[in-house]
């Protein structure tokens, strides 16, 4: 048996970040070329995921990368918006600052109140705006999900999960932190607590109840062991409770519908 931190060190001990960066940049160029798009657009919150995507997009596309900063001023910390605008200034990105507060309130006035549903509505409003500009400018939408959040379904379906390309989805959150440092993302962004900002005081690890270090260790084993079971994990790893392993595995299993296209009806016409 080994402590989970030993496995985590294997996950984050990547020596070829330069190759990873080159491969992502090549992927972005190829996708935009293949789809005959004129550039890319993405939401920029000021968090590590979207800032990492901003650094990659700025290098590959320059002014053909449009960053949309879309706070809801009633819930989004002003420091987040400030960080996003500072990154834009440093990278010289084309951008638009759109406060979605008014749009969200118009919806809310006609809907019964529910914090989670209205929080996810914020993500879906942002997705609508991003795709509006994608349509307007013939741009592809860059998603900002990392592998950890993608695999546990920690994103809003048809909200921040909506994208044409997912450039950082093969990097677990703990790997992304190291990669972000490598490409020059500022330390205050790298060390910042992850937050979807769907409501006031909304932080990812607090909502999930488990650290990304533990999440990534379990997800790595789910992805790489031939026949993962909770009991097998607990037989081989210490430092993570059975309750947490079960929760991560259930999130992985129960959110698969978020990672696939809608189910299609089979033959509805019968035999001919």
Task: Kindly give the residue locations of the regions a language model identified.
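Catalytic nucleophile loop
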Residues: 50
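Catalytic-core regions of hydrolytic enzymes
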Residues: 124
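Short, charge-patterned binding micro-sites
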Residues: 53
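ATP/NTP-dependent adenylation/nucleotidyl-transfer catalytic domains that generate, transfer
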Residues: 2-40, 56-59, 63-66, 73-80, ...
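Conserved G/P- and acidic residue-centered "switch" motifs that form tight phosphate/ATP-binding loops
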Residues: 47
């Amino acid at each position: 048996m080994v402590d989970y931190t030993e496995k985590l060190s294997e996950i984050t001990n990547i020596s070829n970040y330069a190759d990873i960066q080159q491969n992502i940049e090549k992927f972005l160029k190829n996708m935009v070329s293949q789809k005959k798009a004129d550039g890319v657009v993405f939401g920029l919150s000021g968090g590590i995921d979207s800032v990492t995507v901003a650094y990659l997009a700025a290098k590959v596309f320059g002014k053909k990368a449009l960053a949309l900063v879309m706070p809801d001023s009633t819930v989004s910390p002003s420091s987040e918006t400030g960080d996003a605008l500072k990154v834009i200034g440093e990278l010289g990105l084309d951008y638009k600052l759109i406060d979605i507060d008014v749009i969200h309130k118009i919806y809310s006035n006609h809907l019964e109140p529910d914090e989670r549903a209205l929080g996810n509505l914020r993500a879906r409003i942002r997705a609508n705006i991003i795709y509006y500009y994608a349509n307007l400018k013939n741009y592809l939408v860059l998603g900002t999900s990392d592998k950890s959040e993608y695999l546990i379904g920690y994103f809003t379906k048809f909200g921040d999960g909506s994208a044409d390309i997912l450039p950082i989805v093969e990097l677990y959150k703990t790997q992304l932190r190291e990669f972000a440092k490598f490409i020059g993302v500022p330390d205050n962004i790298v060390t910042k607590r992850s937050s979807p900002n769907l409501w006031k005081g909304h932080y990812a690890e607090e909502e999930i109840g488990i650290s990304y270090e533990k999440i990534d260790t379990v997800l790595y084993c789910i992805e790489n062991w031939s026949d993962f079971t909770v009991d097998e994990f607990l037989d081989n790893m210490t430092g993570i409770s059975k309750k947490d392993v079960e929760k991560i595995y259930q999130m992985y299993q129960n959110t698969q519908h978020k990672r696939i296209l809608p189910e299609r009806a089979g033959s509805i016409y019968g035999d001919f």
